[in-house]
């Protein structure tokens, strides 16, 4: 009977998803790939953010809080650049560090990636959105790098 109970306890613990932090988010910014691969991720849920970077001999993980102004800035940049309507190109690229941005909150909800480039007409808008996330990462993780 003890083995039976222990089995169900282990089964219950195994079924708890440790990746929940990474699947339930409002905003996601990630960069990955390249000849010398890197993996960089930023997940934002509410006012909490989780950042990780692996590559180039570094391994950084950091959790931090965001202010309401920082969240409003992200949403404003997404709206000003009409993030949802940015068009991805369909070229095939290899050994390229690509950036992916996923927005699950608000009217600009969409998933975009420059893995096969962004259409020329939308490059400036894409760069504005990516720059906003990049600046946020740089300001919050300067001490961790």
Tell what function each PLM region has:
Residues 16-55, 61, 65:
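N-terminal export/targeting and maturation segments
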Residues 47, 66-69, 114-121:
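A short, sequence-level motif marking secondary-structure junctions
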Residues 1-23:
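Bacterial Sec-dependent N-terminal signal peptides
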Residues 17-34, 85-145:
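Short, well-ordered, aromatic-rich surface patches in folded extracellular/luminal domains
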Residues 54-56, 76, 115:
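Surface loops and adjacent helix of pleckstrin homology
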Residues 61-87:
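Mature extracytoplasmic domains of secretory-pathway proteins
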């Amino acid at each position: 009977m003890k083995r039976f109970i222990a089995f169900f306890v282990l089964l219950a613990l195994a079924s708890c998803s440790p990746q929940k932090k990474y699947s339930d988010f409002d905003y996601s910014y990630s960069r990955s790939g390249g000849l010398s691969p890197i993996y960089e991720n930023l997940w934002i849920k509410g006012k909490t953010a989780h950042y990780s970077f692996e590559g180039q001999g570094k391994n950084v993980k950091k959790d931090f809080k965001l202010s309401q102004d920082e969240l409003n800035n992200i949403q404003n940049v997404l709206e000003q650049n009409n993030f949802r309507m940015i068009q991805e190109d369909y070229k095939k690229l290899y050994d390229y560090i690509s950036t992916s941005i996923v927005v699950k909150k608000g009217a600009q909800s969409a998933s975009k990636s420059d893995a096969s480039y962004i259409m020329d007409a939308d490059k400036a808008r894409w760069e504005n959105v990516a720059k906003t996330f990049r600046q946020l990462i740089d300001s919050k993780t300067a001490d961790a790098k």
